[in-house]
């Protein structure tokens, strides 16, 4: 620990820095001893600790503290609350500058201050200066770290971990699946995932018998999420954190889970007669803010949180659309005020023309796209229209051949990865059935089979200058591609082009590859000498390289014979 400070008066008695050495852009954690305070520590109007600190640039930040309780982890990796451990207060922040900080933690009971402790600390210079992820600031069609480095999401959903007992809506309280999948993803350069915090099982805070205003009974799950954050950091995975999902608040609709919902009046601590009332009931609105406050207090420090997602497929809930929109506005404003760290905010819908997902309160547009044939074309079409209409990044955060049944087919996965990457979206389209894909080997004994496709996509993505103001999205019409089966998606700058050329008839329903020959397409580039490299999207290697000189700002390209798909990088060398 780096310091301990005691107080002589008030109910805050001591603060201990738990971080050995505080460093910019790394977690700084503190434990606060409070005596004699009374109230519900999950309701800030009843009892709260606020951490206010001034950074070296003179700016002041306020971040909530949270209740923590020690857990035991058995030989099977199951997390349970330690019955001998008392709850304690903790604070977590990520300093973004090196230098001296002044901090103050204040205790409030029934919104009246009843204790305070002041202290100073210093943050050493950062080893990793990339910072948090946000929207690229000039063109608004990609993502970047605070230092300007582009971040291209490559990955899949891993919304929960262990095998679920769907009848009971329970699952083992372990991290085995997340750890295994994230380690495999990291091996093959995948860097993005998505996690649900709201389901009745796994990491969810709202089980059938849970209280809606007090998370004491699920602090073992909160501790498991602490360790999942560490696993994400170790494997360089940046995850979307989803607060609620659609099934919680529909009665008989898609994936309904209303009977298991803690808010349901038929359950021990519930009080809602109708699930749609969640969006307007004053108590629900207050408790939603308590929940968001706790999550941001405990995990908001993490640079590995890609974004906060308020709802998964909120269109499937029983709420009125106007009420849903008003709720999202209120919660987004609350999140931005409460989270002292610059995380993005979004929401999602199963319908890609649902008006809410385009609302300008969100940092990017979050789409879901399932189905084949035509999935590649629809990903490209919807992304193109959305970007030109709304001038924000678009992500396909769920994709798959079939939305309702676990179905693994390598054609669908490969094409969705590349379509997302090359169709005017700054990320791969993200597959849904992660558990089935983890086990998929295509008849081989290769346990990494389904993960190998990530690395070539990641390598090719590194070449694309996402922040180039002269870059434009191109498809077959603009490139005058001449072949009836071949199609193309990609990016054309003044002196480069990065293209994905694919057999549009090679789909799940037509999985036999056909040799594609005699393709031509036209590019307009600055005059000069260029390097043309052809890329194997399955092995991740450039298999053919040639030089050419462009005169008259025009070149006709003839791809080599291929099956399935290939990619092209053409770059000016002088």
Q: Each predicted region: which residue ranges?
A:
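A generic structural motif
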Residues: 52-54, 108, 144, 533-537, ...
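Aromatic- and carboxylate-lined catalytic core of secreted/periplasmic carbohydrate-active enzymes
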Residues: 39, 402-404, 413-546, 560-574
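Extended acidic/polar, glycine-enriched regions
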Residues: 66-138
